[in-house]
């Protein structure tokens, strides 16, 4: 049998392309030497990978060493076919085998300036926009609220107009037919500035998927991507060593966002705001807290969503008169778990920006107004990072996520000197520009700076595309402006409405336990506060009511006295206020352990059983005294009991 005629195979790596003349009966491992001759000298031979598609794009990637016994003709390769090669260099293989690989050539920017070797990617490691999910509507798990809003038709129904409608009661015309939730005339009439997320999604879907065309469904939403693609199929070295029109982002044209992910922020009780303001009133320093609550339907806007805030948790921080410095939050996951068991989630952040006016009437200085700013560039960057950490899962996006429901609230003074709440979100473009390290805050709070590739102060490698925005010039004409070096922050901001319910019904009505991380103003969370709140009064019904405090639940969780089932019961009692569940809680081993610990620490509960609710609680007015009473007549007297209690508490 005559030997098969040799064929030409094409190979492509990030260093370029080359051809090899091979025999169809030749096995793949025997090609190693020929392949290495066409690659850089520092390639690790054992890391060679072959694929039928560009490396990292979902092709059938196989290690060359694993193809022992597999011939070229066996896999169906023919004359002129192309294979893609991936590899690691020796230095990268020894230091970090899982990292991306770069060649030993000097990396340079687009302007020719060399890139330092120690540069790293900023913020989050860039991913590729091509990493989409196949059929996301079958895989992505949305929130129950989104599923419920998806099932609604969203139409705005109108009654028959007696002046314009000429038909009968069962007819319909242009003057009474239902409107789409994104109808511009209806929104202008109701003074709705932004579309709700689901209204915007249906507006985009109406133009993306037309039922009359009977084409396959395509997810209508796509998040912007302003970073360099890392899986470019052109075959050039990855950025910053190489770039082309396929992998570089297009120019950015900023414009006000027409929709918002959340339409309204509702605080379950005014006490939530007052407790945060108390810190400023006592110290004069600013304060920050994270909002925990739920997302519900907002009926004032078509297909609207509102964030209902039920609790504010204040993380470790250093507070000053003109700002806040956040510290590491070691128990964040534990607090999130307590909130989850209560049916809550982290919905946003709130901070104060207050300065007393000095008039003695409680008025504050108005810093934020139309002639200054509403949210500073630093605060927008902070809000963008928070939203990037809390993406919104949705089956209507190709990547399975789109935007974020995370909100940002500010307590500041209005034009009348009163303290008011303002609610905002950073736009989708702002979040991506912060991810891509394109913008940075400015010392002037009303403008945002555009980064420059030449700035190496942060030791970062980044690609900065062109950024433009439109403004009304001195001639009254809308003109496009280059955003470099800075542009107004209003292009990155979305305003929300806020308010309080007509009748407050918070799920934590007994929020009197000391708030965490307030030692700087002399407030701390101690066992004596737990005893005073839960057991000192001797009333089981009151104990069930008093456990309904989010700060108390977090403190009890940190004590690790309850099992998972008991803690779930504790959170259920705190949110439902069910007396039957409360009695189950009082009879659990965890509750008995808590009472024992309070007793051993000097916070002794009553000796006798629970008192009759009709009986008044025992007075504890002498609890703060340190002197011992006079010698009692009987060792069983109340004075001796108090003396023993104070002695046990002397280590405070």
UniProtKB/Swiss-Prot annotation:
Main location, first listed in the record: cytoplasm
GO MF annotation list: ubiquitin binding; ubiquitin protein ligase binding
Source species, domain of life: Eukaryota
Comp. bias intervals (Basic and acidic residues): 633-643
Topological type in the membrane: Peripheral membrane protein
Gene Ontology biological process terms from the UniProt entry: mRNA transport; protein transport; ubiquitin-dependent protein catabolic process
Positions of the MPN domain: 265-402
Its biological purpose: Involved in the import of nuclear-targeted proteins into the nucleus and the export of poly(A) RNA out of the nucleus. Has a role in the endoplasmic reticulum-associated degradation (ERAD) pathway.
Designated name of the protein: Nuclear protein localization protein 4
Species of the source: Aspergillus fumigatus (strain ATCC MYA-4609 / CBS 101355 / FGSC A1100 / Af293)
